[in-house]
Design a protein with these regions (language model features):
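A conserved FAD-binding loop/helix module that cradles the flavin
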Residues: 161-165, 273, 279-328
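Beta1-alpha1 glycine-rich phosphate/pyrophosphate-binding loop at the start
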Residues: 2-3, 7-77, 149-150, 155, ...
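A Rossmann-like FAD-binding core segment of flavoenzymes
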Residues: 5, 72-100, 105-106, 168-267, ...
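Glycine/small-residue-rich loop that forms an oxyanion/phosphate-binding "nest" at active or ligand-binding sites
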Residues: 79-101, 105-144
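Glycine/Thr-rich phosphate-binding loops of Rossmann-like dinucleotide-binding domains
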Residues: 43, 121-122, 161-162, 184, ...
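FAD-site-proximal beta/loop scaffold in flavoenzymes
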Residues: 6, 118, 123, 128-145, ...
């Protein structure tokens, strides 16, 4: 028999946005559950140190995740791990069915999608073949395996520069490879990476193939985009940080989204579907930081409380205030 659980709000994903949303809905005395496919923390678990979260000059990613979880649970949010959500559908009566891979159904009149994203792949030959055998998307998870090795880091944003710097703790040499001649990482992050004597920066260059032997990566075939010159770069590992795509597949076909799959919301974080809210890295916005994720989540949780109050009183849902800069 299928297990059915009823709540006032279901939150999909236990990253910073999901746990913050759970904190606020819990404080509003709403029956709240946070469903997480893995472990609480989201991208915090893949980040060694956080230095730009107000109040914490220097905090380990997993420590901040633990603090978030404890805070949310203190105010009544139930966090269920190893509970991947397979689909979210809205009934005619306005209730949502959130179905997990195991077949459990979580029913609620409101849902906040905070499912984050997954790393974007290079889509080059050898990437899948050598995944876990030289190809990685997580420096903290796999960096220690490359002590004394030569490795590549691919990307031009904060993640690529920060992780290249981190990986020099283990690797003897790190090639930081970027397809453009300028980096989009913040200036401070760039300066730190570029000043590291173990890092060699290679610009205007792409990886065409990841090559290996006997089941392990041995080198990468790279190509300069300006000259067309190709060469082999000897390395036993490649860490790929070229962005990520939103985990919105469970709902994307039923809600307004942009070309990349990010969910479009109003100023209260409500999507085009009444009662369905979004926060954090699944939402279409310019910045993707821990601070913006928890800001989104705070607004979404307040929006949920207002939506439920109106629903209980038989009133229409309150209209969201216009977005900043929107025409009247």
């Amino acid at each position: 028999m299928v297990a059915t659980h009823e709540y006032e709000v279901v939150i999909v994903g236990a990253g910073p946005a999901g746990m913050c949303a759970g904190l606020y809905t819990g404080r509003s005395m709403l029956r709240s559950v946070v469903l997480e496919r893995g472990f609480p923390g989201g991208e915090l678990l893949n980040t060694e140190v956080i230095e730009d979260y107000i109040g914490f000059e220097h905090v380990l990613g997993h420590e901040l995740a633990t603090k978030f979880q404890a805070h949310a649970e203190k105010f009544g949010a139930e966090i269920r791990t190893s509970t991947p959500v397979e689909s979210v559908t809205r009934r005619a009566d306005g209730q949502f069915d959130c179905v997990t891979e195991s077949g459990e159904v979580f029913v609620a009149p409101t849902v906040i999608v905070t499912a984050g994203g997954t790393p974007v792949k290079l889509d080059v030959p050898g990437e899948i073949e050598y995944a876990g055998k030289g190809v990685s998307y997580c420096a903290i998870c796999d960096g220690a395996f490359y002590k004394g090795h030569t490795i590549l880091v691919i990307g031009g944003g904060d993640a690529a520069c920060e992780e290249a710097d981190f990986l020099t703790r283990y690797a003897e040499k790190v090639y930081l490879v970027h397809r453009r001649d300028t980096f989009r990482a913040s200036k401070l992050v760039q300066q730190r990476a570029f000043a590291n004597p173990k890092i060699e920066v290679i610009t205007d260059t792409v990886v065409d193939e990841i090559v290996g032997a006997e089941g392990l990566m041995t080198h990468a075939r790279i190509r300069n985009l300006k000259t067309g010159a190709a060469s082999d770069l000897i390395a036993t590992g490649i860490f790929i940080f070229v962005g990520f795509k939103p985990n919105t597949g469970i709902i994307r076909d039923h809600v307004e989204h942009d070309a990349a799959g990010y969910l479009i919301t109003d100023s209260m974080m409500q999507t085009s579907v009444p009662g369905l809210f979004a926060a954090g890295d699944v939402r279409a916005q310019l910045t993707r930081q821990v601070t913006t994720a928890v800001g989104d989540a705070t607004t979404a949780a307040i929006g949920v409380e207002k939506y439920l109050t109106a629903r209980k009183n038989g009133q229409p849902a309150p209209a969201a205030p216009p977005m900043l800069g929107a025409s009247a």
